[in-house]
Every structure is written in C-alpha cells, then in structure tokens.
Design a protein with these regions (language model features):
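Aromatic-enriched hydrophobic runs in primary sequence
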Residues: 7, 15, 37, 42-50, ...
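A short acidic, helix-capping loop that chelates divalent metal ions and anchors anionic groups
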Residues: 14-17, 52-57, 91-96, 134-136
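Serine-esterase "nucleophile elbow" of acetyl-processing enzymes
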Residues: 1-49, 55-60, 72-76
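Alpha-helical cap/lid subdomain in secreted, periplasmic
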Residues: 31, 63-149
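Catalytic metal-binding/acid-base residues of hydrolase active sites
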Residues: 11-12, 50, 90, 129
Length: 149
C-alpha cells in the first residue's frame, strides 16, 4: 500500500472557522481523498495542525513551525510515496511580517527536507488559500490584517 502524507495547517486539519470545531472525517478534504483512492492501494496520512507555519515560531502556540516537525513526521510515517504540502497561510499573519519571498523560502526548505528524507518522494505543492475579503475588518481573524494579503 502506498502512503500519501498530507502536511498542512488548519485547512488540512479540517477546522470549522466559525465554531473552531473540526469537520468529521467524511467532510475533510483528506477524508474525501482517502475514500476516492483507497481502493487503488493508497492510504492517506493526515498531518494537519492549526496555526502551523513553514519556518515561523508562534510566540503563544509552541510547536507550530513546520520545518522543525516535518523531518520527524516523515520518519514516523515511512515509507511515503507522495507528500501533499499545503502550508503558507499562517505565514501571512501580521506578527511575522513575512514577504512572499520569505514564505517561498520556507516552502523551499520544506521541499528540501522532503527530498533529503527520500529523493524519490513525489511532492504535490498546494498554494495557500486566498484570505478573501474582509481581512482587517471586525469579525475577521485578528491575527491577519490588510498587509497579510
């Protein structure tokens, strides 16, 4: 059986933004993917964590820096055929003041870590989601502002 590691943030975790609850397995994109491909000999490993970044350490929520965690997770789940890398949204938080180039450098580091663990691993890179309209307005996540988009 081939394994697909889905490494990401709250979007991979399946966070319901309005309630902070979690979507059930059948609703999360990782669960939907799993159902579609399991009959073809694939197993989906879900590694989503709310607040996870590429290279930034959150001062109030420890162990969110993907670059520190990814090598351990890769080793834990060996052998891995494919990694779906879906990070970068939290890197846009106001506290980090990151440029697109800095976020891109973080993604490059994660890709290097994946290839260092096994040069034959396939990588699917998923772009960070669009934060959408309303960033910086009342009711929107206060960790983001107009400079985050």
């Amino acid at each position: 059986m081939k394994q697909i590691l889905c490494f990401g943030d709250s979007n991979t975790y399946g966070l319901i933004p309005a309630t902070k609850d979690r979507y059930d397995w059948n609703t999360r994109w990782t669960g939907i993917l799993s159902k579609k491909i399991e009959k073809n000999g694939y197993r989906v490993v879900e590694e989503g964590l709310c607040g996870r970044t590429t290279i930034f350490e959150d001062a109030t929520r420890k162990d969110r820096k993907g670059a520190d965690l990814l090598p351990i997770i890769l080793e834990t789940h060996k052998p891995i055929d494919t990694v779906v890398l879906m990070l970068g949204t939290n890197d846009c938080k106001t506290a980090y003041g990151a440029t697109a180039e800095k976020i891109g450098s973080g993604i490059e580091l994660l890709i290097k870590q994946i290839k260092d663990s096994d040069p034959d691993i396939n990588i699917i890179l998923v772009s960070p989601i669009e934060l959408g309209e309303g960033v910086g307005e009342e009711g929107f996540d206060i960790e983001f502002n107009e400079n985050s988009v």
